[in-house]
């Protein structure tokens, strides 16, 4: 189940009714009688492979011209006459061809026919045009209906849901309106968007209709839960999120519409459309991802405004999505106190049309002045914690030094052979992935199955060998993480790896790539001198990729051979100084088990370009869960060091327990609350 928590509105006026609401909330796992059953069918492990034949926009144009297929150049797609549609479908009442209904993605070559709903890869399109293959393959290109089990559940839930204004109890209507912040959203707006309410689950139901409104393809349920003095929301999609490609509000879009506002929540679209009258669409996965399959539906618009949220994460997501849609037609609403989320703006009495007019262009020239940057600088100064990046929930001491995980950076991670580098970095990445960071794993040393087994054990925080009855539960939850794996193993060319990473960033909006490890990826073909030069070149390529794509890259590099009784330093990284120079962060897993006995490990941050803080903190390995937990509070001590070559700062001698100096801090051992991806401000 896809779950996304979002803080919401104050409940001071609803506290007397809290018990009643909490007693009735909860989405039933199965609305039909009988034993519980699984919602989704099992699928194979998500593995990201390189497209068979990468294609460029120029090659697509040449191919279409060579086969006499008329086409038009669009913002992110090429529009052509569809060979999958019948001639009668392509002509209007006058008998003249009215539009090009085939959309071909300029980056991937993936196509979609709006008339016949045929879709497929660029190789599928070539095979169809050239008459290769058989009828069965061409029939397979047609968009498939949802799984039978899913479609049955969709119909069952939709039939049980009723319009909110038809609830028999007026007190229940008022309670639901307040819980979801709909006090100023009219019934006409809810009716226009076909929004319903599921009483047994106390959830709003947003439908996903097929293009043209021909049928119901899926649902999104939004459940409100009391949390402290506010409300949190849980989203459930049917089918599962990876197959849920609904642009909520699409049936209301006219062919003549040239402007649209994109939001990350359905409730925001309701508020915007009601207040401004402009066409609004909601991205199916919020700020997490913009699937390329949705780009054809956005081709007709000359102006696209992103109003995704009120935090820096929403702002960064808007800039990333604008790159897919052609930045020259995209505008961004900057988060701020006077520019909250659309629903909050409506409830707070703001002028939403005026806010939209202040949207900033996503595209600018290569040279800018401070006048164009001052608002972004102010945004970082006013949101220091968010600007520092996403915080780890499992490694609070790492937050104290690195402050957070930031996009566009390069992290180099090293440690002695057998110290647990892969085990640690898998938990390190899993922590971020569990918080919604789209992650791509490139494991060149161990197989994906073995890596997935380790990560699943860490995710469940316990071995599943003796609890196989719980495997499906944890596997279902693990399967819904935005986690992908390259299928490479052993030596691969840097060009192939970078092309795969580029493809993943475009298709899956990957924000974090792990390469484990650099030496295995390079292989052993080069001579020693050539090998160092090749490694420097590869590190430079990864550095450029991280910067150009605003994607964090973590490189695992083996150290050079050192004496067992010596600690590793930044200079211990194999190769020249290129790795440490290009890296924004350098992490070293120190293993002292050969000197002081087993289990004595600690993580050293020897470089931190963000704010310069460096230091070390102890790690304690839990063999049962394969995790590196934080030691007890009385043992945990964060140590600041001046540089990576100096000795570790000793704790001060003091009779008082926990005494510290300016260069030493006590670790609390308590994980700080991680930044929520879509935290809503409380309305007054």
Curated annotation (Swiss-Prot):
Changing residue 360 to G: In MTDPS7; patients manifest multi-organ failure; requires 2 nucleotide substitutions. Residues 384-635 form the SF4 helicase domain. The keyword Transit peptide applies. Residues 1-31 form a transit peptide. GO terms for molecular function: 5'-3' DNA helicase activity; ATP binding; ATP hydrolysis activity; DNA helicase activity; identical protein binding; lipid binding; protease binding; single-stranded DNA binding. Its EC number is 5.6.2.3. It is a peripheral membrane protein. Changing residue 359 to T: In PEOA3; reduces helicase activity. Keywords: ATP-binding, Deafness, Disease variant, DNA replication, Helicase, Hydrolase, Isomerase, Lipid-binding, Membrane, Mitochondrion, Mitochondrion inner membrane, Mitochondrion nucleoid, Neurodegeneration, Neuropathy, Nucleotide-binding, Primary mitochondrial disease, Progressive external ophthalmoplegia, Transit peptide. Residues 659-677 have a biased composition (Polar residues). It is found in: Mitochondrion matrix, Mitochondrion nucleoid; Mitochondrion inner membrane. This is Twinkle mtDNA helicase. It is linked to Progressive external ophthalmoplegia with mitochondrial DNA deletions, autosomal dominant, 3: A disorder characterized by progressive weakness of ocular muscles and levator muscle of the upper eyelid. In a minority of cases, it is associated with skeletal myopathy, which predominantly involves axial or proximal muscles and which causes abnormal fatigability and even permanent muscle weakness. Ragged-red fibers and atrophy are found on muscle biopsy. A large proportion of chronic ophthalmoplegias are associated with other symptoms, leading to a multisystemic pattern of this disease. Mitochondrial DNA depletion syndrome 7: A severe disease associated with mitochondrial dysfunction. Some patients are affected by progressive atrophy of the cerebellum, brain stem, the spinal cord, and sensory axonal neuropathy. Clinical features include hypotonia, athetosis, ataxia, ophthalmoplegia, sensorineural hearing deficit, sensory axonal neuropathy, epileptic encephalopathy and female hypogonadism. In some individuals liver dysfunction and multi-organ failure is present. Residues 121-372 are annotated as: Required for hexamers formation and DNA helicase activity. High relative levels in skeletal muscle, testis and pancreas. Lower levels of expression in the heart, brain, placenta, lung, liver, kidney, spleen, thymus, prostate, ovary, small intestine, colon and leukocytes. Expression is coregulated with MRPL43. Residues 637-684 are annotated as: Disordered. Residues 640-684 are annotated as: Might negatively regulate ATPase activity. Changing residue 456 to V: In MTDPS7; infantile spinocerebellar ataxia phenotype.
């Amino acid at each position: 189940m896809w779950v996304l928590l979002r803080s919401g509105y104050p409940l001071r006026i609803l506290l007397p009714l809290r018990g009643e609401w909490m007693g009735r909330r909860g989405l039933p796992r199965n609305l039909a009688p009988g034993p519980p059953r699984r919602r989704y069918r099992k699928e194979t492990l998500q593995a990201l492979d390189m497209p068979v034949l990468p294609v460029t926009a120029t090659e697509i144009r040449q191919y279409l011209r060579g086969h006499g297929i008329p086409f038009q150049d669009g913002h992110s797609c090429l529009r052509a006459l569809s060979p999958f549609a019948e001639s009668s479908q392509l002509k209007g009442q006058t008998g003249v061809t009215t539009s090009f209904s085939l959309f071909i993605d300029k980056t991937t070559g993936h196509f979609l026919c709006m008339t016949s709903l045929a879709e497929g890869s660029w190789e599928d399109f070539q095979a169809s045009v050239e008459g290769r293959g058989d009828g069965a393959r061409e029939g397979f290109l047609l968009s498939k209906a949802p799984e039978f089990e899913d479609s049955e559940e969709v119909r069952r839930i939709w039939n049980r849901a009723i319009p909110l204004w038809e609830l028999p109890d007026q007190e229940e209507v008022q309670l639901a309106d307040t819980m979801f912040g709909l006090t100023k959203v009219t019934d006409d707006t809810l009716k226009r968007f076909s929004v319903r309410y599921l009483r047994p689950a106390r959830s709003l139901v947003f439908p996903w209709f097929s293009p043209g409104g021909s049928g119901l393809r899926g649902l999104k349920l939004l459940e409100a839960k009391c949390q402290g003095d506010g409300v949190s929301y849980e989203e459930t999609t049917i089918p599962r999120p990876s197959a849920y490609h609904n642009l909520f509000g699409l049936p209301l879009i006219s062919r003549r519409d040239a402007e649209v506002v994109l939001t990350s929540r359905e409730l925001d679209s309701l508020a915007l459309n009601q207040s401004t009258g402009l066409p609004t669409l909601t991205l199916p996965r919020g700020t997490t991802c913009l699937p390329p399959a949705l780009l054809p539906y956005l081709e007709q618009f000359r102006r696209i405004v992103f109003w995704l949220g009120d935090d820096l994460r929403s702002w960064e997501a808007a800039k990333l999505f604008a790159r897919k849609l052609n930045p020259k037609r995209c505008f961004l609403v900057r988060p701020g106190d006077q520019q909250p989320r659309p629903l909050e703006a409506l409830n707070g009495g703001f002028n939403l049309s005026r806010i939209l007019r202040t949207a900033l262009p996503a595209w600018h020239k290569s040279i800018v002045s401070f006048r164009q940057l001052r608002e972004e600088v102010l945004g970082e100064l006013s949101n220091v914690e968010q600007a520092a990046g996403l915080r780890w929930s499992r490694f609070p001491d790492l937050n104290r030094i690195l402050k957070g995980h930031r996009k566009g950076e390069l992290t180099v991670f090293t440690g002695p052979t057998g110290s647990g580098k892969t085990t640690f970095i898998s938990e390190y990445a899993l922590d971020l992935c569990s918080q919604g960071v789209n992650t791509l794993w490139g494991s060149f040393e161990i197989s994906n199955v073995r890596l997935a087994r380790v990560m699943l054990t860490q995710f469940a925080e316990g071995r599943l060998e003796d609890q196989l009855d719980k495997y499906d539960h944890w596997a279902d939850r693990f399967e819904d993480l935005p986690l992908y794996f390259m299928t490479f193993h052993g030596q691969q060319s840097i060009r192939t790896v970078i092309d795969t990473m580029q493809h993943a960033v475009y298709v899956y909006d990957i924000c974090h790539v792990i390469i484990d490890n650099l030496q295995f990826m390079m292989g052993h073909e080069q001579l020693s001198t050539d090998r160092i030069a090749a490694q420097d070149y590869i590190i430079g390529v990864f550095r450029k990729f991280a910067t150009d794509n605003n994607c964090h890259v973590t490189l695992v590099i083996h150290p050079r051979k050192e004496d067992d009784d010596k600690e590793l330093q930044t200079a211990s990284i194999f190769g020249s100084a290129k790795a440490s120079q290009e890296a924004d962060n350098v992490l070293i897993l120190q293993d002292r088990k050969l000197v002081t006995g087993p289990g004595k490990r600690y993580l050293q941050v020897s470089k931190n370009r963000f704010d310069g803080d460096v230091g070390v903190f102890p790690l304690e390995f839990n063999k049962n869960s394969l995790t590196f937990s934080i030691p007890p509070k009385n043992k945990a001590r964060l140590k600041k060091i001046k540089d990576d070559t100096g000795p570790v700062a000793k704790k001060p001698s003091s009779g008082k327990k926990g005494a510290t100096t300016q260069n030493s801090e006590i670790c609390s051992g308590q994980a700080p609350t991680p930044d929520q991806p879509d935290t809503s401000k409380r309305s007054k």
